[in-house]
């Protein structure tokens, strides 16, 4: 039996926010994987180590969590007023598919630094010292992200004193602006609130009728009230991720919310759409202790939010869900806004399992409709390893 040798693919392993993933320049991918399709998906799954029935991704670069089973492809952009196109693939851990239905807000922070270092940004746009403005086209959802990347001596500055709850070590701050984050793309309901309401009654079999804010901003997200499903909003991962009944409940909420939002046509479609929508629960502030042991006082935050990603409670907060939180908080009457105390607000600081995060959004009413021009938050990013990733030559 002939054994196919491994091939080497240029790649960079980066942390972005509270996630990490394998980044590729489109031009560096094997020719068969330069276009969307089965070959690309198979390559990325093999790189990450999926599908893995053991759920560990031992034979790949993945870390067996939703935050670490991620891939990114970046290319020079042909679009006016954009520097690069950014495509994100969320790799299923134990099933054979890559979910292309949404963005990763955390890894968005690493796209600008990767693009600059990889020669994908016009050198004339990169100062010797200061801040480079990288204009990113987020190809999954058809939106613009503006990244403010610190530059020292002509190179991306990665070290610094910016601290991010959920990340152990400080690093340089990368500010992100998510422009016009509400949905307009086909299949997303065509608006920020696909049902037309700030709050809906969502009928969930086995759970009952829940008040829900279903919003598409940053990423489609279903917000429910913590106390309506038996929680306080102070839960850490262990309280939910080991509870099969709770996880099944959240997946049922997610499926029925997706149907109401027009993201799926039948409930059975949700099984292969793990990345979107997200489901989250909100509560008014109370004291709690974060997963690091750090106390979070009720007075330190405007509200509490817990969110699930890929079927598990997230260890911190997905960046795109933070955009949804900031956007919903800015619009009076949503469940997120009410949990934060109601009224008009341009920014909120919310408590999550790892600590706190501040996110802002600019919202205005036009013709009776709420419009959000942008959401803003800060993350950090750092190269962890660069070189080549190896995969068997017959893997795709």
Tell what function each PLM region has.
Residues 1-396:
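A glycine-rich beta-to-alpha transition motif near the start of alpha/beta enzyme domains, typified by
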């Amino acid at each position: 039996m002939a054994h196919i040798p491994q091939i080497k693919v240029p790649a960079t392993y980066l942390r972005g926010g509270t996630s990490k993933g394998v980044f590729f320049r489109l031009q560096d991918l094997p020719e068969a994987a330069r276009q969307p399709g089965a070959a690309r998906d198979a390559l990325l799954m093999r790189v990450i180590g999926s599908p893995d029935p053991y759920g560990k991704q031992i034979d790949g670069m993945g870390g067996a969590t939703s935050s670490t089973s991620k891939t990114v492809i970046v290319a020079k952009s042909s679009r006016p007023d954009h520097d690069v196109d950014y495509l994100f693939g969320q790799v299923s851990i134990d099933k054979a598919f890559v979910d292309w239905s949404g963005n990763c807000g955390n890894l968005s922070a690493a796209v600008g630094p990767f693009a600059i270092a990889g020669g994908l940004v016009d050198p004339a746009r990169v100062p010797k010292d200061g801040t480079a403005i990288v204009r990113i086209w987020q190809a999954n959802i058809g939106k613009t992200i503006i990244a403010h990347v610190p530059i020292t001596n002509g190179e991306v500055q990665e070290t610094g004193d910016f601290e991010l709850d959920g990340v152990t070590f400080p690093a340089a701050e990368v500010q992100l602006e998510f422009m016009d984050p509400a949905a307009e793309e086909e299949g997303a309901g065509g608006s920020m609130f696909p049902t037309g309401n700030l709050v809906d009654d969502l009928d969930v079999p086995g759970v009952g009728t829940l008040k829900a804010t279903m919003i598409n901003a940053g990423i489609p997200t279903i917000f429910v009230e913590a106390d309506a499903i038996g929680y306080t909003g102070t839960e850490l991962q262990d309280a939910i991720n080991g509870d099969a009944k709770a996880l099944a409940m959240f997946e049922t909420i997610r499926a029925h919310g997706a149907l109401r939002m027009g993201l799926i046509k039948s409930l059975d479609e949700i099984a292969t759409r793990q990345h979107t929508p997200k489901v989250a629960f909100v509560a008014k502030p109370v004291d709690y202790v974060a997963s690091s042991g750090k106390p979070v006082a009720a007075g330190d935050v405007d509200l509490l939010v817990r969110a699930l990603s890929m079927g598990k409670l997230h260890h911190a907060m997905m960046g795109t869900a933070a955009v949804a939180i900031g956007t919903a908080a800015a619009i009076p009457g949503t469940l997120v806004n009410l949990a934060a105390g109601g009224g008009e607000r341009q920014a909120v600081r919310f408590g999550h399992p790892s600590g706190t995060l501040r996110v802002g959004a600019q919202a205005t009413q036009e013709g009776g409709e709420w419009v959000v021009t942008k959401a803003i938050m800060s993350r950090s990013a750092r190269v962890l390893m660069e070189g080549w990733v190896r995969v068997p030559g017959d893997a795709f």
